[in-house]
Amino acid sequence: MNDLIEKAKKVKEASKKLMNLSENEKNRALSCISQKILEKMDFILQENQKDMENAVSKGIKGALLDRLKLTEDRIKQICKGIEDVIKLPDPVGEVISMWKRPNGLVIGQKRVPIGAIGIIYEARPNVTVDAAVLCLKAGNSVLLRGGSEAINSNVALVKVMKEGLLEAGIEEGSIEIVEDTSRETAIAMMKLNEYLDLLIPRGGANLIKTVVQNATVPVIETGVGNCHVFVDESADFEMAKAIVINAKTQRPGVCNAAEKLLVHKNIAESFLPMIVKELMAKGVEIRGCSKTVEICKKNGIEVKEATEDDWYTEYLDLIIGVKVVDSIDAAIEHINKYGSKHSEAIVTRDYFNAQKFLDYVDAAAVYVNASTRFTDGFEFGFGAEIGISTQKLHARGPMGLKELTTIKYIIYGSGQVRE
């Protein structure tokens, strides 16, 4: 616990120096970090191999094991990501607006760093670098707490990044990692209001729930993606098939993958057998409502019946829940009840249904005739993101550099006093 406090203090102190660094100074630090990661690749892969062996011994497999794995190519991609962040414009110091009051006061809004940010995340070593780099570019220091599965990889990456900071002449306390992965230490970190200005959890539903229930530090919820694709009665079947297959199977272990398929009852008899066969051919397990099970059975397809828990579940795997709905209103009601406010899609040729879906579905990103897989900072055109916010304050959707800053009001006077 003392180690946690000491590292939090270092991060807080470093934040005071980072906030006034120039864009060139921050970019040089990021460039040094990228070079160090490439130089120390063998060491990083060696430490990652320890995590992989531990994970296999614990029975971790499939998409979860893949998310933990680092390779030479993946490390090169991480470094390419750093170079991409270097190219992004620095939001810090931007004057958003300025106006003059009748009394002569000139008031402006200026973008400034948030300060010291805590990140709690699960078994994805790339997040260690992504989070640190984005926080630094936005002028913030960062206290990282990864999952136990990736502890060797994460500690190695932070060690190497600190070497890059020192080479660039930047305070090494700008990046710290909590090596104690116990639940007790994580909960203690959630209460470090004295040192942390913001806490961002990245992971599954249980992690997000734990943070929201225990944190006294302000939190931005990210990541849980119980995403739906609703195929409306007017949908083009080929388009719908392509969107569903992509949303579910392209990368099933990410938060913007589709977890549920809703199909309008008027097309269920014709569309369901086709899409279920296509999904099963891709290795997807189907968990259907009673109507889905009945239609599939008539067509010689055996599928598992879904439980109530299935409708709430983010699988992060080749599993999908399938439900037949009576109308677009029923689809919207289902999504707003069971969804996680992340990304939702409708496939339709009906303009009014498309607009209704956009207006009434409560989510950070709502799609018409496109895959949910596009909810991503790069795909949205504003570069890397630290996560997908599923709440409405202070940020919503992909969180890029601007979302890692806040507003400061600057006021110029000439001796005005209030009467």
From Swiss-Prot:
Subcellular location: Cytoplasm
Keywords associated with the record: Amino-acid biosynthesis, Cytoplasm, NADP, Oxidoreductase, Proline biosynthesis
Involved pathway(s): Amino-acid biosynthesis; L-proline biosynthesis; L-glutamate 5-semialdehyde from L-glutamate: step 2/2
One MF annotation (Gene Ontology) recorded for this entry: NADP binding
GO CC, alphabetical: cytoplasm
CDD domains in UniProt: ALDH_F18-19_ProA-GPR (cd07079)
PROSITE patterns: PROA (PS01223)
EC nos: 1.2.1.41
InterPro entries, sorted: Ald_DH/histidinol_DH, Ald_DH_C, Ald_DH_N, Aldehyde_DH_dom, G-glutamylP_reductase_CS, Glu-5-SA_DH, GPR_dom
Reactions it catalyzes: L-glutamate 5-semialdehyde + phosphate + NADP(+) = L-glutamyl 5-phosphate + NADPH + H(+)
Pfam families for the chain: Aldedh
Matches recorded under PANTHER family: DELTA-1-PYRROLINE-5-CARBOXYLATE SYNTHASE, GLUTAMATE SEMIALDEHYDE DEHYDROGENASE
Similarity-based family: Belongs to the gamma-glutamyl phosphate reductase family.
Function comment: Catalyzes the NADPH-dependent reduction of L-glutamate 5-phosphate into L-glutamate 5-semialdehyde and phosphate. The product spontaneously undergoes cyclization to form 1-pyrroline-5-carboxylate.
HAMAP family assigned to the protein according to its UniProt record, in alphabetical order: ProA (MF_00412)
Identification of the protein by name: Gamma-glutamyl phosphate reductase
Name of the coding gene: proA
